[in-house]
Swiss-Prot record:
This is Ornithine carbamoyltransferase. One of its GO terms (molecular function) is ornithine carbamoyltransferase activity. GO terms for biological process: arginine biosynthetic process via ornithine; citrulline biosynthetic process; L-arginine biosynthetic process. GO terms for cellular component: cytoplasm. The gene is argF. Belongs to the aspartate/ornithine carbamoyltransferase superfamily. OTCase family. InterPro entries: Asp/Orn_carbamoyltranf_P-bd, Asp/Orn_carbamoylTrfase, Asp/Orn_carbamoylTrfase_sf, Asp_carbamoyltransf_Asp/Orn-bd, Orn/put_carbamltrans, OTCase_ArgI. SUPFAM superfamilies: Aspartate/ornithine carbamoyltransferase (SSF53671). Carbamoyl phosphate binds at residues 57-60, 84, 108, 135-138, 269-270, 297. The lineage of its organism: Bacteria, Bacillati, Bacillota, Bacilli, Bacillales. It holds the Pfam family OTCace_N. It is found in: Cytoplasm. It is an enzyme of class 2 (transferase).
């Protein structure tokens, strides 16, 4: 660890990327790249991370559990349905009890307000592994992937096409923080949350970022360096069949990507539904870096875990 310093973060928790400065984000990315090359650094020897899941997961659960093992610690799976919190115990009581047993909490749930309360009432770090409003760990890995490809955020255009969901929200805040140009194209009625857009625009004024919310996918991807999409049906929305027709013009396909730079790269947070939000030709083609992106969840989260745990140690 002599060549790379553990980033010092001015926060106990990570609930949204709004809580981090541009400098902290860059430091986390550089630290994540270091950990990617040095997988078995035992920086969290003996530490226990509680993993609370109210939603199904592949990447989030496996990457956090594997990350804790590689860092010398342990990830403890906790099903939200099986905990007393699922039977009426308050979030506040749960936070205080878990703070007596373990060293940190990662939670993947529905209500962002519950995660905020969990963080407020706990004395240990709390990481938002996904809520209906935000997915900061995914956005941090996305920034790492972009940084590895181009080594800068200045002058980079990221185009997000599809549903203005939690992933889109976190990408808006992330892009605003690091000074990127981000365009979002959604059907009318599926725009990202207005309050989050306003926050991103306010941050962009300070950082020089450019944020655009559009309804024209061709305009959104015009001269883009990166094109990003997500599933049209998020968990719990599977019955909204009319969305398929409405979203069809927003499919990432060979015609749409002609408007981007020839050197563009394709991103997707996964899981993907081929021939819906993206064609197999694109996601399985040479421009796609979705599996490198998925792999970076592990490394970005390890950097975050070490930084948050070390900060709490120094403060205690």
């Amino acid at each position: 660890m002599s060549t790379v310093q553990v980033p010092k973060l001015n926060t106990k928790d990570l609930l949204t990327l709004e809580e981090l400065t541009k400098e902290e984000i860059i430091s986390l990315i550089e630290f994540a790249i270091y950990l990617k090359k040095n997988k078995q650094e035992p920086l969290l020897q003996g530490k226990i991370l509680g993993l609370i899941f109210d939603k199904h997961s592949t990447r989030t659960r496996v990457s956090f559990e594997a990350g804790m093992v590689q860092l010398g610690g342990h990830g403890m799976f906790l099903s939200g349905k099986e905990m007393q919190m699922g039977r009426g115990e308050t979030v506040s009581d749960t936070a205080k009890v878990l703070s007596q047993y373990i060293d940190g909490i990662m939670i993947r749930t529905f209500s962002h307000a519950d995660v905020e309360e969990l963080a407020k009432e706990s004395s240990i770090p709390v990481i938002n592994g996904l809520t209906d409003d935000h997915h900061p760990c995914q956005a941090l890995a996305d920034l790492m992937t972009i940084y590895e490809e181009i080594n800068t955020f200045k002058g980079i255009k990221l185009a997000y096409v599809g549903d203005g969901n939690n992933v889109c929200h976190s990408l808006l805040l992330a892009s605003a923080k690091v000074g990127m140009h981000m365009t979002v194209a959604t059907p009318i009625g599926y725009e990202p949350n207005e309050k989050i857009v306003k926050k991103a625009l306010a941050i962009a004024e300070e950082t020089g970022a450019e944020i655009e919310i559009l309804h024209n996918p061709e305009l959104a991807v015009s001269e883009a360096d990166f094109i990003y999409t997500d599933v049209w049906m998020s968990m719990g929305q599977e019955g909204e069949e009319e969305k398929y027709t409405l979203f069809q013009p927003y499919q990432i396909n060979k015609e749409l990507v002609k408007h981007a730079k020839q050197t563009y790269r394709f991103l997707h947070c996964l899981p993907a539904h081929r021939e819906e939000e993206v064609t197999g030709e694109i996601i399985d083609g040479p421009k796609s870096i979705v599996f490198e992106q998925a792999g970076n969840r592990l490394h970005a989260q390890k950097a975050l875990l070490v930084s948050l745990f070390k900060n709490v140690e120094e403060l205690s």
